């Protein structure tokens, strides 16, 4: 038999190792969804869900979606995925939910078709990937609004049309103003050019007239001088005749 003193340290060592293995912290699986998603009645909406796990994606991975209507405390299971197969639970979403996730790509999304106003509520995505099963679920709130895309589109189209019409009108006015201004400017320039040409023409005519009138004036002066000299000559002859008498 072994002494009891030797068995005690071995037992303590084994206990410590076992405790270390059991108490070693493991990373919890993390699940991500949007916090709020909006949809319109009659359309469809995708509720995205992704996750991160410290373990390899195993064949035992499972995904469960729950739904809790607004103003209600009851929660319903609506989608379940396990062993590579998805199943839609009976309920208000029986024929309107589609599994579109791919766990190997860490995707656990679903699509809700033909939305109704009564679908407002909270959808919870829960993922388990053994042995990584510790973690919190993630939730997304769905808000379904009344169908109004046609009216909204009509209003938006009217606004865009009015804006374009205003832009076109303003552009035409600017072009007209610019055209009138350029035309007026060209007319003023033509008038100024005509005035300048008229002034030059008048100056030339006046210079020609002055040049023509100068010889005439000289001729008239010469004639006047000739006549005065003739008168003086005649006057002198008459005086001489008087003296002779």
Swiss-Prot record:
Alphabetized CDD domains for the sequence: IgV_P0
Report residue spans for region: Disordered. Answer: 199-245
Q: Does the keyword Cell membrane apply?
A: yes
What keywords are annotated for this sequence in UniProt?
Cell membrane, Disulfide bond, Glycoprotein, Immunoglobulin domain, Membrane, Signal, Transmembrane, Transmembrane helix
Q: Does the keyword 4Fe-4S apply?
A: no
Q: Where is the composition biased (Basic and acidic residues)?
A: 199-208, 224-245
Segments in the Cytoplasmic topological domain: 175-245
Main localization of the protein? Answer: membrane
Q: Which GO terms describe its cellular component?
A: plasma membrane
Transmembrane region positions? 154-174
A Gene Ontology annotation in the biological process aspect, one of them, is: cell-cell adhesion via plasma-membrane adhesion molecules
- Disulphides: 49-125
Q: Which residues lie on this side of the membrane: Extracellular?
A: 29-153
Topological category with respect to the lipid bilayer: Single-pass type I membrane protein
Write the signal peptide boundaries: 1-28
List the carbohydrate attachment sites.
120
Which ranges carry the Ig-like V-type domain? 29-143
What role is this protein assigned? Creation of an extracellular membrane face which guides the wrapping process and ultimately compacts adjacent lamellae.
Per the record, the similarity remark reads:
Belongs to the myelin P0 protein family.
Q: What is this protein called?
A: Myelin protein P0
Which species does this protein come from? Answer: Xenopus laevis
């Amino acid at each position: 038999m072994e002494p009891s003193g030797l068995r005690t340290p071995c037992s303590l060592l084994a206990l410590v190792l076992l405790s270390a293995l059991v108490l070693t912290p493991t990373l919890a699986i993390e699940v991500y969804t949007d916090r709020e998603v909006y949809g319109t009645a009659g359309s469809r909406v995708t509720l995205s869900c992704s996750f991160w796990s410290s373990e390899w994606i195993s064949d035992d991975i499972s995904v469960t979606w729950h739904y809790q209507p607004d103003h209600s405390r009851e929660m319903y299971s609506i989608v379940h995925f396990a062993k590579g197969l998805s199943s839609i639970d009976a309920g208000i979403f029986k024929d309107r939910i589609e599994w579109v996730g791919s766990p190997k790509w860490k995707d656990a999304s679903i699509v809700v078709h033909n939305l109704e106003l009564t679908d407002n509520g909270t959808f919870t995505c829960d993922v388990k990937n053994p042995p990584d099963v510790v973690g919190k679920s993630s939730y997304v709130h769905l808000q379904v609004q009344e169908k109004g895309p046609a009216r909204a589109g009509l209003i938006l189209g009217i606004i865009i049309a009015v804006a374009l019409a205003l832009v076109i009108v303003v552009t035409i006015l600017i072009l007209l103003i610019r055209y009138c201004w350029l035309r007026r400017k060209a007319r003023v320039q033509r008038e100024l050019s005509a005035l300048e040409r008229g002034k030059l023409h008048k100056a030339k005519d006046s210079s020609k007239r002055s040049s023509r009138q100068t010889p005439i004036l000289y001729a008239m002066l010469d004639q006047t001088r000739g006549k005065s000299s003739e008168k003086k000559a005649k006057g002198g002859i008459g005086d001489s005749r008087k003296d002779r008498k």
